[in-house]
């Protein structure tokens, strides 16, 4: 083929390589991206991590631009049409050495997760090397990725003129087709090539509680996002084993009906918890505290937006993960990778995870780290599962859903599960900076309630509602200096004084209990993303916890009915309030919707509201 003149993009999806050519433009906001009006018209948007600034979220501003390739021509080519050559990186090393990275991991475990700032966080480091001819090197690496990497979502090379990106991303961030929005949370890592792993090793990986909970946490986080995108929330499908050349992951698909514009969806879903953490907006703050530089496009998205033959908007937007960034100006090659840190993470285990994640890209540049696996298609694209079709592996995957909430396995329209005592009753949800409240809103609407959801700092009055939900959120509930905790205590005080029917969840529960005079403490081990069986008011329930702090059970019950989790409160009931330390809306709470229904009926019946 003729020598390509940038800008252009080569994208391999579905065993075909698409060559897109056009012009590149730079934009300030996602809403500034041009609308694709005609069937067959397309644009390829490159959304940097710093785009968070347009939503007011925390990040290092490194100036990486929001760009779009306005597609003017498209053709399909084969691997044989690509230039041949050798990809080689020289003087390559991670910018943060292994020991330093392990110390950074420990700092996040001790300073953030243990202090209630979140359940999981992704800490990045970057492999940096140099090459002589960036364009030739990029093409050689692209060709190698097509042959070597298996089961990638996109394998691509994008040349904007002053920057080159080549990678094999495993993960769809979000897609849109016929009004259905799909996300694809991937987490949990088998840190070796599937082709060299034994069945016992794969089954041990699938039964590892750390790996299992890691995936459940990102499923919860993406369910939050899709509850913002569609009123009926998301529906989960999976889990599946996703096998790459040098490692394997577990994954779900989550789908939601939506009427949102593609650009609005991109804005609402910045960015995937698999590249950031949870709760998402506090994860951005934690990343800014612990990473010393901007992320460029790492953790951002590439979004191919167009229209189908019926005029419906379409979008295919993978995460920018497992990508090498080549700078023609200085010959540098950068491969950023991150590990997901959760309670129980081993710092050096997370070091090994970053090596495994970088390996798939680095092998394409001649940095040999281990064998590949899989057969190849007619295009030379590696494919074919090694373990995904094994009966024991499939059974192990299916068994994971036995512990999860069936609520999120099907759509529930507003009022579909209506309870007479709840129909038409009004509820205010106070959002304490955790979008679990968006999942709560979906559940409450399905029960027939009329829902208003507000950030804590936008609530002017709690009057005029039949019920108030004091929601979850990150942070130390004992902090007298934190404005959010001050506001949350004030809400709890007013709700108790007015005898307003109240459901308080996690942080809201802790703040309400503090106003009731109960003692809070920091747990010796965080319960972030843990499922625990607890006796709850006469029933044994599997409950999903995301807490680093808890309320100690009082010696005397007083006016309360208590549910204990050892020395701590799992829940308490008062005459006009219920406090729940766990998350009934979480996929980890097996019968969360039934628990919500019982408590809401009790509250609204007892008070005559």
What are these regions (language model features)?
Residues 4-15, 122-213, 305-335:
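An anion-binding catalytic pocket shared by soluble metabolic enzymes
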Residues 12-137, 211-213, 231, 237-242, ...:
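Non-catalytic accessory segments adjacent to catalytic cores
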Residues 73-92, 130, 190, 197-288, ...:
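Contiguous alpha-helical scaffold segments within structured protein domains
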Residues 255-388:
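Conserved hydrophobic core element of enzyme catalytic domains
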Residues 384-419, 586-609:
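Acyltransferase
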Residues 419-427:
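A short, charged/proline- and glycine-enriched loop
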Residues 426-427, 434-504, 516, 604:
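Flexible gly/pro-rich beta->alpha loop and the following alpha-helix that scaffold active-site loops
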Residues 489-495, 501-505, 509-598:
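Pocket-forming structural segment of enzyme catalytic cores
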């Amino acid at each position: 083929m003729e020598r390509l003149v940038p800008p252009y993009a080569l994208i391999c999806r579905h065993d075909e390589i698409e060559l897109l050519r056009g012009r590149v433009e730079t934009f300030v906001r996602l809403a500034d991206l041009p609308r694709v009006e005609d069937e067959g018209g397309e644009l390829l948007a490159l959304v940097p991590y710093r785009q968070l600034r347009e939503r007011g979220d925390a990040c290092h501003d490194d100036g990486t631009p929001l760009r779009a390739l306005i597609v003017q021509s498209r053709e399909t080519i084969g691997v044989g049409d690509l230039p041949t050559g050798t990809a080689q990186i020289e003087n390559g090393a991670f910018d943060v050495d292994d020991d330093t990275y392990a110390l950074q991991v420990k700092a996040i475990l001790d300073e953030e997760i243990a202090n209630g700032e979140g359940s999981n966080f992704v800490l990045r480091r970057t492999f940096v090397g140099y090459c002589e001819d960036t364009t030739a090197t990029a093409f050689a690496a692209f060709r190698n990725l097509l042959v070597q990497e298996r089961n990638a979502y996109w394998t691509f090379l994008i040349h904007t003129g002053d920057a080159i990106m080549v990678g094999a991303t495993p993960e769809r961030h979000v897609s849109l087709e016929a009004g259905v929005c799909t996300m694809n949370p991937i987490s949990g890592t088998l840190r070796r090539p599937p082709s060299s792993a034994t069945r016992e090793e794969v089954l041990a990986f699938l039964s590892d509680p750390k790996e299992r909970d890691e995936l459940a946490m990102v499923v919860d986080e993406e369910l939050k996002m899709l509850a913002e995108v569609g009123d009926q929330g998301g529906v989960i499908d999976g889990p599946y084993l996703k096998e790459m050349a040098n490692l394997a992951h577990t994954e779900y698909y989550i789908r939601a009906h939506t009427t949102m514009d593609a650009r609005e969806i991109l804005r609402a879903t910045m960015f995937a918890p698999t590249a950031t953490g949870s709760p998402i907006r506090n994860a951005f703050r934690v990343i800014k505290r612990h990473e010393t530089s901007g992320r460029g496009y790492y953790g951002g998205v590439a979004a191919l937006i167009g229209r189908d033959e019926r005029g419906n908007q379409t979008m295919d937007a993978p995460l920018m993960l497992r990508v090498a960034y080549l700078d023609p100006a200085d010959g540098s090659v950068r491969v950023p990778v991150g590990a997901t840190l959760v309670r129980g993470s081993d710092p050096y285990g997370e070091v090994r995870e970053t090596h495994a994640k970088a390996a798939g890209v680095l092998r394409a540049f001649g940095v040999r780290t281990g064998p590949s696996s899989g057969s190849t298609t007619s295009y030379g694209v590696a494919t074919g599962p090694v373990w995904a079709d094994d009966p024991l592996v499939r059974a192990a995957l299916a068994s994971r859903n036995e512990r999860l909430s069936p609520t999120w396995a099907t759509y529930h329209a507003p009022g579909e599960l209506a309870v007479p005592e709840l129909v038409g009753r009004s509820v205010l949800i106070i959002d304490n900076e955790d979008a679990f409240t968006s999942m709560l809103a979906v559940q409450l609407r399905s029960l027939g309630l009329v829902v208003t959801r507000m950030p804590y700092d936008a609530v002017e009055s709690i009057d005029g509602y039949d019920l108030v939900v004091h929601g979850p959120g990150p942070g130390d509930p004992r902090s007298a200096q934190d404005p959010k905790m001050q506001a949350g205590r004030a809400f709890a005080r007013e709700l108790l004084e007015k005898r307003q029917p109240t459901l308080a969840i996690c942080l809201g529960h802790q703040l309400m209990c503090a106003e009731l005079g109960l003692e809070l403490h920091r747990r010796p081990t965080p319960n972030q993303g843990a499922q625990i069986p607890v006796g709850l008011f006469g029933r044994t329930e599997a409950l999903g916890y995301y807490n680093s702090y808890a309320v100690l059970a009082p010696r005397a019950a007083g006016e309360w009915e208590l549910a204990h989790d050892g020395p701590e409160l799992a829940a308490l009931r008062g005459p006009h309030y219920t406090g729940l330390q766990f998350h009934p809306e979480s996929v980890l709470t097996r019968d969360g919707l039934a628990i919500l229904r019982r408590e809401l009926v009790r509250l609204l019946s007892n008070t005559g509201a």
